[in-house]
Amino acid sequence: MSHSAEPLPMTARRSGPLTGEAQVPGDKSISHRALILGALSVGETHITGLLEGQDVLDTAAAMRAFGAQVERLGEGEWRVNGVGVGGFAEPEGVIDCGNSGTGVRLIMGAMATTPITATFTGDASLSRRPMGRVTDPLELFGCEVTAREGKRLPLTIKGASEPVPVRYKTPVASAQIKSAVLLAGLNAPGETVVIEAEPTRDHTERMLAGFGAAITTETTAEGHVIILKGRPELKPQPVAVPRDPSSAAFPVAAALIVPGSEIRVPGVSRNPTRDGLYVTLLEMGADIRFENQREEGGEPVADLVVRHGPLKGVTVPAERAASMIDEFPILSVIACFAEGTTVMQGVHELRVKESDRIDAMAVGLRANGAEVVDTQDTMTVHGKGGLDGGATCATHLDHRIAMSFLVAGLASHQPISVDDGGPIATSFPDFLPLMRGLGAQID
């Protein structure tokens, strides 16, 4: 998908039982980090299972622009010859990160403590998203940031020539902020420290340790504390990317709400910092089994077996929000097919994602007959065991909104359409063929 494609309307219709195996794509978070850490290592990193969605391809192109050799060997198989910590070259052109908030924020961190200048841009959706929450801590290292009003893209960073180590307490639970600070800390002398009120997804810490960085985590009175020793020589690693639990959520949800369904989703990451949706679904009474539990690339992995069955409404506590922040849109759909009220707490971060995801879901679900109440920090769905359907939903260039409404249409009484399914390619390029292969009617 190019960055300026024509809208691609799609419609999902009530479908028969979904059956078969759903091979979801590689994890997006780990794919970005594998390319970036490979570029910051000295030598050759071999990656398998890489997600080849537009977001990750944009990160691969950025690593090339900073001087790393990045080549695709085959499907999901890539090789990165890195330039080492502090070895990034100044890019010739502008770094276009497309739709990827993860990509742009991690890359800004990775270059902020190198004495080079880089300009970052993105699509219309990314250019509306707040970057100050990442650039503010990066400036503490000594880099200079020039941005549009509101600290939004396009944005130029002049990297620090003499970076200093930073001790930073994150103001919101965000793995992107934490990761940007840690990546910047790689090329600062001494120890860089990040303090979180509660732990967020920990792929960066796991992978930094795997690549040879000295990194420790501890829980103190201040919170969750991560300490990184600066200026390590990162050693290249083979990275086997597990399958993305956030992408798996869509076929899993479809199987839970379409009567008679039973599907298998192999090799999905069960990282506890990403597991909130599955914890919640089990509380709702979902029939999900985790088979063949194992570890791949430092991440716990399992095969999911999912069957349709009755579901009940639950309350999702705010402290679980960070471990399922990308899954609230699809959970709001599942909640419509449950009996009883589901309350999602602590969801304010969703208002600054690719779109205001709370508003987008609430408006679209109401248009399709659901009873939804939202506040700044909560979303409540009064489940009636089904959904009327019949409406067209605005996706606001947001891949997860588009996929959520298409899944809803597979079990609603009337078809559900989305105004633009094009953005799905950013995270899940094979969404349509995969869902159709299970028996979903989407056109």
Swiss-Prot record:
Keyword Lipid biosynthesis: no
Binding positions for 3-phosphoshikimate per the UniProt entry: 28-29, 33, 174, 176, 326, 353
Active site, UniProt feature: 326 (proton acceptor)
Pfam families given in the database record: EPSP_synthase
Residues covered by region (Disordered): 1-25
Catalyzed reactions per annotation: 3-phosphoshikimate + phosphoenolpyruvate = 5-O-(1-carboxyvinyl)-3-phosphoshikimate + phosphate
Pathway membership: Metabolic intermediate biosynthesis; chorismate biosynthesis; chorismate from D-erythrose 4-phosphate and phosphoenolpyruvate: step 6/7
Binding residues for phosphoenolpyruvate: 28, 101, 129, 176, 357, 400
Compartments where found: Cytoplasm
GO annotation, biological process: amino acid biosynthetic process; aromatic amino acid family biosynthetic process; chorismate biosynthetic process
EC numbers on record: 2.5.1.19
Gene3D superfamilies registered for this protein in UniProt: Enolpyruvate transferase domain
Gene Ontology MF terms in the entry: 3-phosphoshikimate 1-carboxyvinyltransferase activity
UniProt-listed NCBIfam families: aroA
Function statement: Catalyzes the transfer of the enolpyruvyl moiety of phosphoenolpyruvate (PEP) to the 5-hydroxyl of shikimate-3-phosphate (S3P) to produce enolpyruvyl shikimate-3-phosphate and inorganic phosphate.
UniProt family annotation: Belongs to the EPSP synthase family.
Protein known as: 3-phosphoshikimate 1-carboxyvinyltransferase
